[in-house]
């Protein structure tokens, strides 16, 4: 038993927020699964780093550049292969839990973030290209992305809805998921295999706010927001409306804590893992945070602790004139821009 097994017993999955060819081919990912990692997430920044720093791509890049393909098609050829390989490594985990764990995420192009139909078309194409039941397509949680979520769920595709900072936007996502499930059920189709995670970003909130807050609130607001979002989640998914869908096989959306590597060196390096452990959630962690948590983290159900204190902290920043929904919109736009820039850097060597 490892600390990751202890976390899993508390109802939370730990995923790895990283993917590269070396990680898969070296057996390192398989070893991480033996330790208790339950899935993998990727994004344009992760692939940009992998392509630049992993020598295993060099021959394929050279070969693909001899073919009549666009840079994006060359990228997708390699990314789809990596995700398919990672899905293979995670398949035993996926099957051992009846399809509830062992997912690997691949993100649609950041340029589609405001294009619902384009997102749907690309998500369908990528999902078909990967060809694995434990593939999850990652879609940004813009209004267009949430519209796409409804359609993709009704198609039977599992989705990782990413770049959530807003509780209100997260609730909109739950409603879109429920509509997609209802459509599929109305068509007489199975829903039990569909899983959606709502990726709620953590550390970027504190990074944005800490310079403006009194010391007593520094490093506290991201966790307070996450705890409040979890209360919202409990209310939504225990309500009679969703219970009716659940009775027909629907799974609950799971909150996934993302951006859980600590950015401020003054904070404990496992802060955003230790503080957010709770049932029906996922935490996707970068390699350094995973190693730190295995070394000196604490497996304890903390997510439901201090709920009143979290609400009080949120009320206090509201009294200071900070509107968390306005902040959330700005952070999402910043995140989209970062992924667009990473995507451009990723494609540049593939021209």
From Swiss-Prot:
It is found in: Cytoplasm. Its EC number is 2.2.1.2. GO terms for cellular component: cytoplasm. Pathway: Carbohydrate degradation; pentose phosphate pathway; D-glyceraldehyde 3-phosphate and beta-D-fructose 6-phosphate from D-ribose 5-phosphate and D-xylulose 5-phosphate (non-oxidative stage): step 2/3. PROSITE patterns: TRANSALDOLASE_1 (PS01054), TRANSALDOLASE_2 (PS00958). SUPFAM superfamilies: Aldolase. It is an enzyme of class 2 (transferase). The active site is at residue 138. Keywords: Cytoplasm, Pentose shunt, Schiff base, Transferase. It comes from the Bacteria. It catalyses: D-sedoheptulose 7-phosphate + D-glyceraldehyde 3-phosphate = D-erythrose 4-phosphate + beta-D-fructose 6-phosphate. The keyword Cytoplasm applies. One of its GO terms (molecular function) is transaldolase activity. GO terms for biological process: carbohydrate metabolic process; pentose-phosphate shunt. Its main location: cytoplasm. Transaldolase is important for the balance of metabolites in the pentose-phosphate pathway. Belongs to the transaldolase family. Type 2 subfamily. HAMAP family: Transaldolase_2 (MF_00493). This is Transaldolase. It comes from Neisseria meningitidis serogroup A / serotype 4A (strain DSM 15465 / Z2491). The gene is tal.
């Amino acid at each position: 038993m490892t600390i990751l097994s202890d976390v899993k017993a508390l109802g939370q999955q730990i995923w790895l927020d990283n993917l590269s060819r070396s990680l898969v081919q070296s057996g390192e990912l398989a070893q991480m699964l033996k330790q208790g990692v339950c899935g993998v997430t990727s994004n344009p920044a992760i692939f940009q780093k992998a392509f630049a720093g992993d020598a295993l791509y060099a021959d394929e890049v050279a070969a693909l550049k001899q073919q009549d393909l666009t840079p994006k098609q060359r990228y997708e050829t390699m990314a789809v292969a990596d995700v398919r390989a990672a899905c293979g490594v995670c398949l035993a985990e996926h099957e051992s839990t009846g399809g509830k764990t062992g997912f690997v995420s691949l993100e649609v192009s950041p340029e589609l973030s405001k294009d619902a139909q384009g997102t749907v078309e690309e998500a369908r194409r990528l999902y078909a290209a990967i060809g694995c039941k434990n593939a999850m397509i990652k879609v940004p949680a813009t209004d267009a992305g949430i519209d796409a979520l409804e359609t993709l769920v009704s198609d039977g595709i599992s989705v990782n809805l990413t770049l959530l900072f807003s509780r209100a936007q997260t609730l909109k996502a739950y409603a879109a998921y429920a509509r997609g499930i209802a459509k599929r059920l109305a068509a007489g189709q199975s829903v039990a295999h569909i899983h959606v995670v709502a990726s709620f970003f953590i550390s970027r909130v504190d990074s944005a706010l800490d310079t403006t807050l009194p010391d007593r609130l520094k490093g506290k607001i991201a966790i307070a927001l996450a705890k409040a979002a979890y209360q919202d989640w409990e209310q939504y998914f225990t309500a009679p409306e969703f219970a009716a869908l659940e009775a027909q096989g629907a799974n609950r959306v799971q909150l996934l804590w993302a951006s859980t590597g600590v950015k401020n060196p003054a904070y404990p390096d496992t802060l955003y893992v230790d503080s957010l452990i709770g049932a029906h959630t996922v935490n996707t962690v970068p390699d350094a945070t995973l190693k730190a948590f295995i070394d000196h983290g604490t497996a304890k159900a903390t997510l439901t602790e201090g709920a009143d204190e979290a609400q009080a902290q949120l009320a206090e920043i509201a009294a200071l004139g900070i509107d968390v929904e306005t902040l959330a919109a700005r952070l999402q736009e910043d995140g989209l821009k970062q992924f667009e820039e990473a995507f451009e850097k990723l494609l540049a060597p593939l021209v």
